Amino acid sequence: MQSIFGTDGIRGRFDKEITYSLAYKVGYALGFIVKTNNPILIGRDTRISGEILFEAISKGIKDAGKEFIYLGICPTPAIPFLIKKEKFSSGIMISASHNPPEFNGIKIFDKNGEKIKRDFEKRIELIMARVDNNKIITNKYKSVSKNNELLNIYTKGLIDSMENENLEGMKIILDACYGSATTCAESVFKKLGANVKVINNDKDGLKINLNCGSTCLDPLNKAIKENDADMGFSFDGDADRVIGVDSKGNILDGDHILFLWGRELLEEKVLTNNTIISTRMANLGFERNWNNIGGILYRTEVGDKFIFAALKEKKALLGGEQSGHILSKINNFCGDGILTALQISKYCKKKNINLESWLNSSFLPYPQKLTNILLSFDFKNINNSNKDLINESIESFSSIKKNDCRVYIRPSGTEPVLRILVEAQNQKEVDFLSTKITTELRSKINKISNNL
């Protein structure tokens, strides 16, 4: 049987892959597994379906004989931070991160504030399979009060991470993406003295991630120019990732953040073996330039759980993904978009340098093209002959290594798409290869879809 867990928890469309029944079973299973009497912490992003899934999860936890505390709408990193600081037994974040509003998901954290590992996932799935469906009754929803003080503890932690540095004199735009960042990003930057303007700052679960946030930088770029700002940062739906933009519209993605932040740590001589961690999506230009200044880039499969494991294994201090998901020792290696934005702003202030100049001192990326092919089927669940049909092309194209060309193809672990990354030293080669690969794979995918 295929696992319900992907690269970042459980993810899918609400009322299709993610149902009340599934959420109840997850809550019940976690409550059954947890052995201490300390409550389970639950948070969510702004999606409309979040309230329904919270109701189901909390009912499951109660039916398993355990207690919970409801944080309400919050950034995902608040959950692991508070688990460690306030000694919760575990935690759940209800969010589909950067996905559209119709999606939702469930991320589970253990007693150490770490995303659960595969053996824990298997235990949850085993218990879920035993839950009597007759127990899952949708009662009339009873309002549950939120613990607002806990969010204040998290935001204080963000401010403390600045180590008495401030952001006075800096004009910064934030795109809160109608999501979790609406709860505290503005107040944190203001408390640190920044002149802040926030766009898309309503808690609107129908607009979350739509034409805004870390996957759509146009609104941020426009606001930076209109307000003559120094820089800006766009968060995703649950604020665990961030992308920056300088005053000229240049993009500071996760690769640039890792290079610049990593170089500071390299100069401070605190990086273990001069190593930072990223994934197979990381740009070759980033890797080559990082190597040129004496650094080592260790690549993992895509997903912050793989980065986290490598950080532990290599005893590294910094890792992340091109998408802006950055893990640092500051907050126990949990991706935190607000914290990352604060650190980048802090370095600009300390170095007395604008983000444009700092970004220009990093590296010139190789041309890349990322194409997503929508799948009408779950890649994990198709029969072996169909899977082999696609894998044959993936293996063939992935073996291309000529002229610093790189191809990486994978089914997404968070949404129904096949991702195709093509990278080379010139854009013409990238476009040619990308078109060739996409055309062949799309033809095979359509053939499979028509036969299902």
Curated annotation (Swiss-Prot):
The active site is at 97 (phosphoserine intermediate). One of its GO terms (molecular function) is magnesium ion binding. It catalyses: alpha-D-glucosamine 1-phosphate = D-glucosamine 6-phosphate. Keywords: Isomerase, Magnesium, Metal-binding, Phosphoprotein. It is an enzyme of class 5 (isomerase). It comes from the Bacteria. Its cofactor is Mg(2+). Activated by phosphorylation. GO terms for cellular component: cytosol. InterPro entries: A-D-PHexomutase_a/b/a-I, A-D-PHexomutase_a/b/a-I/II/III, A-D-PHexomutase_a/b/a-II, A-D-PHexomutase_a/b/a-III, A-D-PHexomutase_C, A-D-PHexomutase_C_sf, A-D-PHexomutase_CS, Alpha-D-phosphohexomutase_SF. Mg(2+) binds at residues 97, 236, 238, 240. Its EC number is 5.4.2.10. Binds 1 Mg(2+) ion per subunit. The modification Phosphoserine is found at residue 97. GO terms for biological process: carbohydrate metabolic process; peptidoglycan biosynthetic process; UDP-N-acetylglucosamine biosynthetic process. Catalyzes the conversion of glucosamine-6-phosphate to glucosamine-1-phosphate. Belongs to the phosphohexose mutase family. This is Phosphoglucosamine mutase. It comes from Prochlorococcus marinus (strain MIT 9515).
